[in-house]
């Protein structure tokens, strides 16, 4: 079983992306409400996939995604993809769109916008070593569902009580400053540290002990069968 020490989440509302460390593709897929129907693989080597000759790219069906998240192959290396609605959508990707997709695979950021009309995508997903560093371009407010999944999965609650709308709204606001969810201590409450700066993922790992000493964080905990956020 994976021992989760911490999760870092920063939401950039203006640029429409979520940057994380400690959250796997498995967590994203299980937690997100609107799951991708298919994914076009821009970077990475899934063991079970289909090949589109026109694009010279691999893609995965919904069934293949289910198999992929259970395999070891999604836990290593870079993995970059966009989702698409129907298989036939791939035939309508223009040369310009293809060049923009390949740019994403190379730079891990979009060249011009996060939506591709031909494939009707909702996500652009770019990760390095699965959980070490991930950036997802999407409707960032919906990412709170993934955080909820990670928290509930970590605590292993038998009767999983979901976050209220109020808790989700507060977490969304806090994530815009950058939050560390600290899972180091075995407890029914989770410490949240506010980063309040743009920071490299490597620095978070190096400075984790420093963040644990700060006093401007929060406790996410269960009280009377509902989630609450209390200041440290």
Go through each PLM region and give its residues.
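Structured alpha/beta or helical-core interaction and ligand-binding surfaces enriched in interleaved
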Residues: 1-232
